[in-house]
């Protein structure tokens, strides 16, 4: 279903897309198509601008549930992660349903995926409980630039707009958020701060379109709004600026700009 953010009313019924639970979605920022991933291991592109919402592309390299999806800022590359520990990079311009990169560098499910907004080929991924690493990739070559052990399950990732900082959210056993700084010259990812406000596993992150705020939601049923990437003194970084139980989502395509809807 597609919902109106202002009224909460359903506006489009996408019908039967997958043969299993559909647990992850991603908007292509250029084509405005919706990409869906499912327990049936398939990935579909849906064109919501056309009557009937036709399926325009199928990707089926995964053998288990697709649990992570993210389009690059230019809409040319899709990153997908699966429960079989596989990360795939797909070229949107290629008609063949085969990824140009397929890697099992992670030792657990790849749910957390985030593209750097200012470095087109820089991709961050996070592994589950049996992996517990954040990996940075050169998406052009498929090479791992850095692998950082976090000591805990990685559930979400979000980049700053232009400062090379990365926010990670975590589940078992730390239930925290961390801010890291990526030094490309040294190929090092260094932790700056930890934020422990959730009382249970942090499930996911969502970022406002202007990058000024990040929302985290946990299994404690609380949504927290953070000012994380503050360029001022460290005292301003990681500030909790809101706490809610009415959980919705930011989306620049339908919301029409920044803000929590």
Give the ranges of each region predicted by the language model.
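Terminal intrinsically disordered, low-complexity extensions flanking WD-repeat/beta-propeller proteins
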Residues: 151-153, 160-162, 173-179, 183-261
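WD40/WD-repeat beta-propeller blade N-cap
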Residues: 15-22, 59-66, 103-110, 149-154, ...
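Solenoidal tandem-repeat scaffolds enriched in leucines and small polar residues
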Residues: 20-96
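Loop/turn segments within WD40 beta-propeller blades
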Residues: 25-32, 70-76, 114-120, 150, ...
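WD40-repeat beta-propellers
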Residues: 1-4, 43-47, 87-92, 113, ...
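Conserved strand-to-loop turn within each blade of WD40 beta-propeller repeats
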Residues: 37-40, 80-84, 126-130, 169-173, ...
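A short beta-strand motif characteristic of beta-propeller blades
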Residues: 9-14, 54-59, 98-103, 143-148, ...
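WD40/WD-repeat beta-propeller blade-loop signature
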Residues: 21, 30, 65, 74, ...
């Amino acid at each position: 279903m597609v919902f109106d953010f202002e009224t909460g009313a359903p506006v489009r019924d996408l019908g039967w897309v997958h043969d299993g639970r559909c647990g992850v979605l991603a908007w292509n920022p250029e084509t405005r198509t919706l990409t869906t991933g499912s327990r049936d291991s398939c990935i579909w592109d849906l064109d919501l601008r056309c009557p009937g919402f036709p399926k325009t592309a199928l990707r089926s390299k995964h053998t288990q549930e697709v649990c992570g999806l993210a389009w690059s800022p230019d809409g040319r590359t899709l990153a997908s992660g699966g429960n079989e520990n596989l990360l795939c990079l797909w070229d949107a311009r290629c008609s063949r349903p085969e990824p140009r990169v397929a890697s099992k560098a992670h030792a657990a499910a790849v749910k957390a995926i985030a593209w750097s907004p200012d470095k087109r080929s820089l991709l961050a991924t996070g592994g589950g409980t049996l992996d517990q690493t954040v990996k940075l990739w050169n998406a052009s070559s498929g090479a791992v630039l850095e692998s950082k052990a976090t000591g805990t399950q990685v559930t979400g990732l979000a980049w700053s707009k232009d400062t090379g900082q990365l926010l990670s959210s975590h589940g078992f056993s730390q239930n925290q958020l961390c801010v890291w700084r990526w030094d490309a010259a040294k190929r090092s990812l260094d932790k700056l701060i930890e934020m422990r406000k959730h009382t249970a596993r942090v499930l996911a992150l969502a970022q406002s379109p202007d990058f000024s705020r990040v929302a985290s939601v946990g299994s404690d049923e609380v949504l927290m709004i953070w000012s994380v990437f503050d360029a001022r003194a460290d005292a301003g970084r990681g500030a909790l600026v809101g706490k809610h139980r009415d959980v919705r989502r930011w989306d620049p395509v339908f919301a029409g700009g920044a803000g929590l809807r």
